[in-house]
Amino acid sequence: MNPYETDKLVAEYLLFHYASPEQVVPPGVPEMMASADFAVRSVARMLQTDLLPRNARALDVGCAVGRSSFELARHCTEVVGVDFSHRFIAAARAVKESGYAEFNRCEEGHLATALRNFLPSEIDRRRVRFETGDAMHLESSSIRINDGFDVVHAANLIDRLSDPLRFLRQLPALVKPGGQLILTSPYTWLEDYTPQANWLGGFYENERPVTTLERLQRELPDFLLLTTQDLPFLIREHARKYQWSIAQASVWVRR
């Protein structure tokens, strides 16, 4: 079974996207507060608002349970969130409908705390819609890709695709000239998700190390790399187990 369709992962991602820092960060480790709210920070810190036209249109690929899509709606009048997981999209649609996320935070074993967290009231949820779709085959989804987007946001996606290069090759047609592409990834290349032959980086080529950022620059000739930034993030599994990672965020402008 796809792990992203399980109750466990849906609950963990709702917590990851919608919980307050105090609900995620373990007591006594205040320095980890900066690793919370990743779905918000990947937009708030990386979106180049001065480059946005009026009535900007955004595509959030691999939106998971949707918090980054709602954050994009602060600045864009239309936002389409797309994810391969039907459960994630159902959860995102439920938040859009109600204005809040309900989920259980695992404490230990079957012990859990029920939480309900509201979206900020100033976010216009009507600007956002969610669709299931395959990031590697966006042309077959129900979104209007031919109209182009002023922003494409893909957070922690590329190292979970079986063929990330196929996703990258769609981007020139997706992003309007002058539009921006926001990518984040910890570059955790694993054969569980991506055959090694399809990794973008993390290997030697003719005895020379190849990094993912270097490969992105090679594979995105229609884009200008504007900036990069390290964005730490924290995923809480239960009260005594956490995943701490550092994503590299990069912003690219369509030539």
Language-model-derived ranges and their functions:
Residues 85:
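Conserved SAM/SAH-binding beta-strand->alpha-helix loop
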Residues 108, 194-228:
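Conserved Class I S-adenosyl-L-methionine
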Residues 136-152:
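A short acidic, Gly/Pro-enriched loop at the edge of an enzyme's catalytic core
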Residues 178-186:
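Conserved beta-strand signature within the Rossmann-like core of class I S-adenosyl-L-methionine
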Residues 94-140:
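S-adenosyl-L-methionine
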Residues 32-55:
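Conserved alpha-helix/loop element of class I SAM-dependent methyltransferases that forms part
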Residues 55-64, 80:
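Conserved class I S-adenosyl-L-methionine
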Residues 165-177:
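A short glycine-rich, Lys/Arg-flanked "PGG" loop and its adjoining helix->strand segment in the class I
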